Design a protein with these regions (language model features):
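Beta-strand signatures of extracellular beta-sandwich domains
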Residues: 48-50, 104-108
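Extracellular, modular beta-sheet/disulfide-rich ectodomains of secreted and cell-surface proteins
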Residues: 33-70, 77, 129-131, 137
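Sec-dependent bacterial lipoprotein signal peptides
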Residues: 1-18
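Noncatalytic modules at the cell exterior or secretory-pathway interfaces
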Residues: 28-40, 84-93
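Bacterial Sec-dependent N-terminal signal peptides
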Residues: 13-35
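Mature extracytoplasmic domains of secretory-pathway proteins
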Residues: 53-103
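C-terminal partner/receptor-binding element of secreted or periplasmic proteins
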Residues: 115-137
């Protein structure tokens, strides 16, 4: 009987918590999300980016071309979502041609790298990157 009473007290003590311990709850946290795409394709490259815009309630799809510097090196392509209040981002990016050049995405939330993925295409497959992830934990 003493063991049962002791276990009951332990469970009761552990289950009690206050909201004052969690000052910045995930529901109230605002995140700055940065999605950075890079390519190893020489001279020219274009990717198709699609994602669901929760605020607009619609899918967004656009082709984006990489810009190259004077040395022919590709510059990173960035998507920035400041003050993002949503829990997730759902989308993908793909190269709309057959190339074996690598396509890479890095997803940063408040400056912290959360996701890094790389994809290489072939002469029969597009390089495709899934950019779906949870922003809040």
């Amino acid at each position: 009987m003493k063991k049962i009473a002791f276990l009951f007290l332990v469970f009761w003590f552990v289950s009690c918590s206050t909201n004052s311990d969690n000052i910045e709850s995930p529901q109230n946290k605002i995140n700055n999300v940065e999605i950075i795409f890079t390519t190893t394709a020489p001279k020219t490259d274009e990717i198709q980016i699609t994602y669901y815009d929760i605020a607009a309630g619609d899918n967004v799809s656009s082709a984006r071309q990489f810009i190259y510097d004077n040395n022919g090196s590709p510059l990173p392509l960035k998507l920035v979502f400041n003050d993002c209040k949503y829990r997730f981002l759902d989308g993908e990016a793909f190269r709309n041609n057959f190339s074996d050049a690598a396509l890479k995405v890095q997803i940063l939330v408040n400056g912290e790298l959360l996701v890094e993925r790389t994809s290489k295409g072939s002469n029969s497959r597009f390089a495709t990157l899934n950019i779906s992830f949870r922003i809040l934990k």
